[in-house]
Amino acid sequence: GNHSHSHEYLVDEDISVIKEDISRSMMIFKSNLGKNSKFFSYPFGEYSLQFKEIIKDFGFEFAFGQHSGVIDETKDFYELPRFPINEKYGKIERFKTLVKTLPLKYKKIYPEEKYLADSKNPPKVKIEFFENIKNLKQINCFSNEGNKWRNSKISFINDNTLTVDISEKFIGERGRINCSLKEADGFWRWLGVQFVIAENG
């Protein structure tokens, strides 16, 4: 799939810079392979609502972030999760765990904009799940707020909707929230959310 031309932090760039970079990568794809890919992977997994629209307008059908999770039929095609498997995160024990991981299906995650200005950091996070998820009250969520991974406080608004209390700002380039739910058979359901911290606040 396409991963941009420069592999720079495009999410912080002007629209014209993003479009020029993607257009160049598509020209190279077409020149060497005779066609363009339907798949796009955001550089560093970073995207904004604006970046998503650009990718849609270029005709890509699927786009991947870098938030962990399992793809299922309910996921936004332009915010697909992926587990990194590489020289740092590629041990066979971890791989065996990942292939047995199940999706944690949700209707909506708020805020929809994952590109955070300083005034929106920390974000007010709300997750609305589908009605048929068993034992949802046993879910656990963790975040790297304040640049330190910790167990996050969650509060249920109703049986299917919860808030994740992020009390400290995300520090650095990315903020992450991971939620997991253990099934009776020992399998885990997993949901990851990634926020991008705006370069200029």
PLM features per residue range, with description:
Residues 25, 63-65, 164:
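Sparse, context-dependent recognition of short Cys/His-centered cofactor- or disulfide-binding micro-motifs
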Residues 1, 52-115:
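Active-site-adjacent pocket scaffolds in enzyme catalytic domains
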Residues 30-33, 37-43, 69-74, 149-166:
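Repeat-unit-sized solenoid/scaffold elements
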Residues 42-44, 49, 64-66, 144, ...:
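Intrinsically disordered, low-complexity regions enriched in small/polar residues
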